């Protein structure tokens, strides 16, 4: 069935099993480009073909994931994905670039599917949507094999890139293109449920999982941009890159559990982890690293358990810089130090504030411009951001993150993607420094919505939101103890 996460609709099925995994080494990706029969429907974005030149609003050198979306462009997207996972796993996991291939081999080629785009995600026809998405995956693989005899056994993961935008974001208005294709992780259960087969047989190879992704997440490249964003003060601020969605989908494929409620779409760890809202940090080109728990689960880090009553210096996030504090035999805290600085003491927001203040105007430079000009990111010749010096740049602040982990909840719910299903009983819970449990709850604040996480959730000296919850701490370092808000109370009240 379809599941959603506030800003996206995706399909999730499958089992995970244990409380640890060995997500190491590298994987080879088979990328298949597919297009649709041409159409001029208003319910989908684009014509059904890949974008070879921009048709929308010109953001000049600040364009995210610019056209042409040809073979080189998708190779750059795979390089960006590799840079992300190499960085956040400390070189323990990544993409085998040499062993990954984009098909077909021609620069502007694609495999033409038998229907228009809207067939594969018909509006309000919930009873057939999942089956049609599965058919898209099946038809893409079969068509590619028929035309190019691809040896799928040479690859670890199949990624179908389709023409058009993903049906993955909530917009601040009625969605004008509801029949765009949702980004999807397809696994064996989904194939079995919809095709009545254990997998898709191609020659002697059985394919039982894969990913479906759009060519872009940037609406501003398409002719619909003017009607959608033409009245915005700065339309270019509505751009998003593909890397975040790509990393999220690959996260599922390699076994990282989702950390939001996949049935309601409600956030649980917000912008502070890849497997929730953090996939779209930094306008989708700087996704957040997985949470401390996820990195330990993947085998990328081993936490340090300090002696009782000891004092520790906690460096910035790096391999081995997670502290584990036991609470009970099943519960413990994981503490990490995260920084969104582009250079010591300087964040993207502080640069914007300084430039705006010095200009004596009421406006500040756009986030997207400062992100691309001043954060040290690297764009390649295809205009894709392929390297980022620090994937914490997209966080709302710098400081400690304190995670409350309950292995009993995790072990009983991980098989059904339910680690954080119940907001009142979560396996991985962020101790929000402002003393409130905002993440995942509906917000009454129109402009400063904390329900996905904000600066006040991080632990740092000078956090005004912490002081509001703990007035006696004004001027002092924040403290986390039995009499603070939040407190160190265990889930059973001890």
Where does each model-flagged region fall?
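Extended hydrophobic secondary-structure segments that form protein cores and membrane-embedded regions
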Residues: 31-32, 156-162, 402-403
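Extracellular low-complexity, Gly/Ser/Thr-rich intrinsically disordered linkers
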Residues: 317-494
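Sec-dependent signal peptide recognition
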Residues: 3-12
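N-terminal module-boundary/linker segments of secreted carbohydrate-active enzymes
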Residues: 22-65
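Short alpha-helical segments and helix-capping/turn motifs at coil-helix boundaries
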Residues: 133-150, 238, 257-260, 318-322, ...
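Extracellular hydrolytic enzyme modules, especially secreted metalloproteases
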Residues: 157-358, 408
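Hydrophobic h-region of N-terminal signal peptides that target proteins for export
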Residues: 11-21
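Active-site-proximal segments of metallohydrolase catalytic domains
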Residues: 72-221
């Amino acid at each position: 069935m379809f599941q959603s996460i506030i800003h996206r609709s995706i399909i999730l099925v499958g089992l995970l099993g244990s409380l640890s995994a060995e997500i190491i080494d590298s994987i080879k990706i088979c990328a298949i480009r597919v297009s649709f029969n041409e159409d001029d429907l208003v319910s989908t974005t684009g014509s059904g073909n890949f974008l070879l030149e921009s048709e929308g609003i010109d953001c000049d050198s600040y364009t995210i994931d610019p056209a042409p979306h040809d073979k080189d462009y998708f190779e750059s997207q795979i390089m960006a994905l590799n840079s992300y996972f190499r960085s956040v796993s400390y070189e323990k996991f990544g993409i085998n670039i040499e062993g990954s291939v984009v098909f077909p081999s021609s620069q502007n080629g694609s495999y033409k599917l038998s229907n228009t785009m809207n067939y594969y995600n018909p509006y309000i026809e919930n009873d057939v949507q999942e089956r049609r998405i599965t058919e898209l995956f099946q038809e893409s693989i079969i068509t590619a094999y028929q035309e190019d005899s691809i040896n799928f056994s040479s690859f670890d993961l199949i990624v179908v890139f389709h023409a058009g935008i993903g049906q993955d974001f909530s917009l601040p208005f009625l969605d004008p293109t509801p029949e765009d294709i949702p980004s999807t992780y397809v696994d064996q259960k989904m194939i079995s449920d919809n095709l009545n087969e254990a997998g898709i047989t191609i020659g002697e190879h059985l394919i039982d999982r894969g990913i479906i992704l759009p060519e872009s997440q940037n609406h501003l490249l398409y002719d619909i941009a003017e009607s959608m964003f033409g009245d915005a003060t700065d339309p270019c601020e509505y751009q998003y890159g593909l890397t975040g969605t790509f990393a999220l989908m690959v996260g599922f494929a390699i076994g990282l559990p989702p950390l939001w409620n996949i049935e309601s779409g409600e956030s649980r760890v917000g912008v502070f982890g890849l497997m929730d809202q953090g996939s779209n940090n930094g306008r989708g080109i700087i996704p957040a690293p997985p949470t401390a728990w996820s990195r330990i689960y993947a085998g990328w880090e081993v936490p340090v358990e300090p002696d009782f009553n000891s004092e520790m210096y906690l460096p910035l996030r790096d391999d081995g810089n997670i502290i584990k504090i036991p609470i009970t035999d099943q519960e413990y805290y994981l503490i990490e130090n995260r920084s969104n600085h582009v250079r010591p003491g300087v964040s993207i927001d502080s640069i914007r504030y300084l430039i705006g203040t010095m200009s004596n105007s009421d406006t500040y430079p756009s986030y997207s411009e400062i992100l691309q000009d001043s954060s040290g990111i690297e764009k390649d010749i295809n205009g894709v951001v392929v390297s980022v010096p620090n994937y914490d740049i997209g966080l709302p602040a710098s400081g400690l993150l304190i995670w409350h982990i309950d292995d009993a909840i995790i072990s009983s719910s991980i098989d059904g993607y339910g680690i954080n299903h119940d907001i009142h009983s979560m396996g991985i819970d962020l101790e929000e420094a402002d003393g409130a449990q905002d993440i995942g709850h509906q917000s009454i604040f129109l402009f400063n919505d904390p329900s996905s996480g904000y600066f006040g959730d991080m632990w740092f000296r000078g956090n005004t939101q912490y002081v509001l919850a703990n007035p006696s701490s004004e001027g002092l370092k924040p403290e986390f103890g039995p009499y603070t808000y939040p407190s160190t109370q265990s889930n059973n009240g001890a």
